[in-house]
Amino acid sequence: MIRLVLILLIAAAALAELPLIAAQPALAYSYAAAGAEPLLDGREALFAAVTAGKWDEAKTALAAMQVDLDYLDQNEDKGAAQAFADAVAAQDAKAVMAAFNRAASDEIVRRLNGARDNLKDYQSAKVLVVKAQRFYTAIAGDLPPDAAKLISNALTQALDAVGNPGVFGVGQRQPDPGAFASARADILKALGKTP
């Protein structure tokens, strides 16, 4: 009897073109962490203010980026923060863009170094390479086309070199430190940084 009722319900639903199961939003899991990136988040406001010649607004936008600039200045590239301060003080739009490109390049290198140091931790390494890609995307238009293409390809290679834990082990690939090192070296060379 229950079987007959189920068959009738299914047939009725099919005839009425009703879904048998209520629609549910699909959930997805990503290893990439968006996270706040003050340099990237502040870039648009900074460039908009500079382009409009609103230097007080540029100073405000720069202030929101200051913690990250100070970190770069102290740990990665002495003078990175000062380059921004000097460019804004001189009201020099080209110098502001050059300072941003310098800081973004520093961030790319920093994230790749972090990924290299965490290559055995898939999630951390992948997130760091993805963040390096975000910084690359921000400056790609300002790079010579050959360098931009080389960096883009090398970032793809670096992401692939991180490996993949697979799903329940299926499709698992171990990290490839040699391929990662090669990709990193290509990126640093294209950015004019020392490996």
Regions of interest found by a model, annotated:
Residues 15-25:
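C-terminal segment of classical bacterial N-terminal signal peptides
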Residues 25-195:
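Mature extracytoplasmic or organellar-lumen-exposed domains after removal of signal/transit peptides
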Residues 1-12, 16:
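Bacterial N-terminal signal peptides that target proteins for export
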